[in-house]
């Protein structure tokens, strides 16, 4: 997403989050679907600028305000640089992700929809080559007016029509006789390549600039499009030359600035926020009716549900303003970041505490469980903060893809590590069921822990793995099903967890150990932690249970 300045956000942010969180929030903000990318000393051969799903009458505007190449203009051969616009089956699949690193996308032909913008620094022109069947994909120089009479459709398409000799071959374009051709589609040659268009290239102070816009004219051209920049001279190892680039990208659909897959997200997040709010209110009503069996962990579960609801509410509002204005409200965006961070921390803390049996079965965590909390929770908080920072940066940044993959791996590691307290509790109950006289109670608790273990496993698979596979295979306009699956799985996990561990007298998980059993657990915990000296055992009766 785009980078924009945030003015005055530091004063309005809560002080308890500390300077590091403020720094991460201030590193970059989202300005919606109006992207501005500035790279200095860049050496990559391929830069993935953006991916967007277009409907009919959707428009893409690109303004290359600065391109300064490392090669000197005195060289005989002009550098091979330019843009490529490719339609792909899924937004998560890049057009050149599996290609040879030494192959230049600007030199290849394609039977699928592909548009190349070849920058010729010698002749100061940009050659536009179109491949595939493109009946109504309109390309014109310049940017669209701010308030067109018809959204997405330009009044005319200024292009240069090449000469065609009697043999049927295409000759060089004649700039002197070029004229607008209106909104008529281009004629396709015998070779399958459309006739070339030529755009002007500006040259000022050893830098180049030009702008163009693309309009999706029919349903046949709808789809997910990837816009990339290529510097083919840097594809050869050891011959990289640094270059500077500043580009502005503005994408729009007839209904707003959101991509095709993001248009339903405003309503989706609003509905899911209401569902989590209703679940939280229902959970609090259960806690108020069963005060005798309520523990602190129950109120922590309620706080998690309400925080999730507020986070989705702010997320929904952000998408609404992005769709209508092209950028979110800065204050609401920061509130979404804060609630998103709180939600991620509370989620893993709650899962780990329930799995370890804290407050339900025991009141002291062992050294192993403390290490899990000391490692997993800070990593998960860091991963959530890092995801927020990545969302506020441009996709074309040099470290964007690498950090996104690393952070996804860290999140999976955290999800796997958080299962250890549940496994340890299951093993403890298995050992206890054969050593003490409370076999029935321990077996009931063991069955409940096994169910919870399966629930956590399913939650991780549905929200981390299956959801990503779904996004990779569904059509571009249905990719919002990824968010639906994630939020639906989260809601189902919350409801099942509340049902399994609700405050009820007949819940085996809430049957605190009495005398002998509790003494054995406290003795084991104190032995593992090394704080046994100076402690005396106190008997607990049913009347001594914690009341909230």
Curated annotation (Swiss-Prot):
Residues 1-32 form the signal peptide. Belongs to the LU7TM family. The gene is GPR108. It is a multi-pass membrane protein. May play a role in intracellular immune modulation by activating NF-kappaB response and attenuating Toll-like-receptor response. Keywords: Glycoprotein, Golgi apparatus, Membrane, Signal, Transmembrane, Transmembrane helix. The keyword Transmembrane helix applies. One of its GO terms (biological process) is negative regulation of toll-like receptor signaling pathway. The chain crosses the membrane at residues 268-288, 297-317, 341-361, 372-392, 406-426, 454-474, 478-498. InterPro entries: GOST_TM, GPR107/GPR108-like. One of its GO terms (cellular component) is membrane. This is Protein GPR108. It is found in: Golgi apparatus, cis-Golgi network membrane; Golgi apparatus, trans-Golgi network membrane; Golgi apparatus membrane. It holds the Pfam family GOST_TM. Glycans are attached at residues 57, 63, 109, 205, 209, 539. Residues 165-190 are annotated as: Disordered.
């Amino acid at each position: 997403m785009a980078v924009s300045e945030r003015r005055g956000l530091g004063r309005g942010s809560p002080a308890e989050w500390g300077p590091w969180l403020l720094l991460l929030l201030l590193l970059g903000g989202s300005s919606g679907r109006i992207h501005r990318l500035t790279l200095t000393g860049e050496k990559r051969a391929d830069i993935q600028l953006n991916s967007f799903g277009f409907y009919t009458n959707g428009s893409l505007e690109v303004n290359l305000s600065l391109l300064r190449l490392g090669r000197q203009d005195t060289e005989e051969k002009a550098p091979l640089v330019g843009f490529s616009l490719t339609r792909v089956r899924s937004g998560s699949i890049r057009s050149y992700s599996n290609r040879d690193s030494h192959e230049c996308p600007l030199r290849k032909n394609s039977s699928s929809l592909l548009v190349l913008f070849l920058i010729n620094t010698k002749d100061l022109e940009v050659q536009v080559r179109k491949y595939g069947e493109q009946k109504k994909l309109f390309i014109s120089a310049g940017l669209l007016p701010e308030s067109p009479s018809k959204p997405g459709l330009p009044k005319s398409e200024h292009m240069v029509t090449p000469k065609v000799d009697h043999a049927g071959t295409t000759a060089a374009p004649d700039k002197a006789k070029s004229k607008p051709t209106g909104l008529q589609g281009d004629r396709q040659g015998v070779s399958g390549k459309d006739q070339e268009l030529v755009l002007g290239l500006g040259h000022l102070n050893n830098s180049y600039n030009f702008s163009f816009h693309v309009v999706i004219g029919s349903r046949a051209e709808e789809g997910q499009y990837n816009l990339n920049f290529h510097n083919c001279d840097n594809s050869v190892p050891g011959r990289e030359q640094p270059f500077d680039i500043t580009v502005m990208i503005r994408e729009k659909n007839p209904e707003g600035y959101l991509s095709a897959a993001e248009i339903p997200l405003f309503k989706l997040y609003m509905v899911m926020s209401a569902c989590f709010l209703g679940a939280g209110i229902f959970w609090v009503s259960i806690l108020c009716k069963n005060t005798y069996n309520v523990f602190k962990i129950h109120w922590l579960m309620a706080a998690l549900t309400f925080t999730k609801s507020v986070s989705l509410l702010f997320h929904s509002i952000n998408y609404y303003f992005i769709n209508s204005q092209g950028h979110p409200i800065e204050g609401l965006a920061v509130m979404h970041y804060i609630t998103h961070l709180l939600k991620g921390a509370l989620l893993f803390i709650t899962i780990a505490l329930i799995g370890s049996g804290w407050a339900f079965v025991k009141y002291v965590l062992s050294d192993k469980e403390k290490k899990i909390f000391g490692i997993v929770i800070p990593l998960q908080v860091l991963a959530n903060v890092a995801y927020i920072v990545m969302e506020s940066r441009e996709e074309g940044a040099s470290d964007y893809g690498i950090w996104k993959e690393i952070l996804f791996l860290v999140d999976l590691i955290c999800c796997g590590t958080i299962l250890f307290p549940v496994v340890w509790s299951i093993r403890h109950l298995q050992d206890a069921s054969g050593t003490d006289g409370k076999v029935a109670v321990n077996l009931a608790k063991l069955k409940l822990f096994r169910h919870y273990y399966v629930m956590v496993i399913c939650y991780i698979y549905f929200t981390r793995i299956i959801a990503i596979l779904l996004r990779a295979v569904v059509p571009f306009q249905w990719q919002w099903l990824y968010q639906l699956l994630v939020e639906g799985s989260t809601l189902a996990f919350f409801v099942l967890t509340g049902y399994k561990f609700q405050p009820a007298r007949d819940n085996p998980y809430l049957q605190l150990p009495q005398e002998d059993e509790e003494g054995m657990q406290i003795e084991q915990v104190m032995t593992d932690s090394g704080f046994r000296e100076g402690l005396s055992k106190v008997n607990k009766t049913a009347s001594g249970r914690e009341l909230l």
